[in-house]
Amino acid sequence: MTAVQEERTTEELKALAERAGRELEDATALEILRWAAETFGDRFCVTSSMEDAVVAHLASRALPGVDVVFLDTGYHFPETIGTRDAVEAVMDVNVITLTPRQTVAEQDAEYGPKLHDRDPDLCCALRKVKPLEEGLAGYRAWATGLRRDESETRANTPVVGWDEKRGKVKISPIAKWSQEDVQTYVTEHGVLTNPLLTDGYASVGCAPCTRRVLEGEDARAGRWAGRSKTECGLHG
């Protein structure tokens, strides 16, 4: 972290993000992450759902030992926790696991069981959105694995943008990638992926709110199936 980075105001960071979004639109994912590493240093992190470790792997090439933030909601598939543990063991990253203030049992006691079925927005707010806001407090910029081809709600994702909700630079280095691009990178670099991706799941979230996708459905159709909800609140 440099003095210049520390002294940037919110307006300066916002202008930086908007300018970088334009200038880096045609850059490669690795070039985007190298820019992030050079610009923000240890005030930059990657968030990962442990669906795969592609962005974490890319970021480790740009900034060895980079912080990789993982939200343990208490509802994850065992395969997801296993992927996190494997990433921590074999990759040059520093995995930071965030947890909600309440355990699942404590939440059940206050709000009743299966809040995810009755009020999924509140459940996501308690177990994802709030913990991430607290966990990102010390960073200026964070990277995600969002891709434009995942759903209509993500079709306009910038490679670098401004996260108005959190007042941070938000970087989506693989926004322009297709699922085929992801698979090519995984194969070429031997990147860890969640075993559920080969078991019918195209997008992996909390176990109670995730199902396998059907042929012809978009990648996120298995999330909160049967509801209009398509995002947990972390990205929109």
From Swiss-Prot:
Gene3D superfamilies assigned to the protein according to its UniProt record, in alphabetical order: HUPs
Sites where the protein binds [4Fe-4S] cluster: 123-124, 206, 209
Catalytic activity of the protein: [thioredoxin]-disulfide + sulfite + AMP + 2 H(+) = adenosine 5'-phosphosulfate + [thioredoxin]-dithiol
Cofactor binding, per record: Binds 1 [4Fe-4S] cluster per subunit.
Names of the cofactor(s): [4Fe-4S] cluster
GO cellular component: cytoplasm
Compartments (UniProt record): Cytoplasm
UniProt name for this protein: Adenosine 5'-phosphosulfate reductase
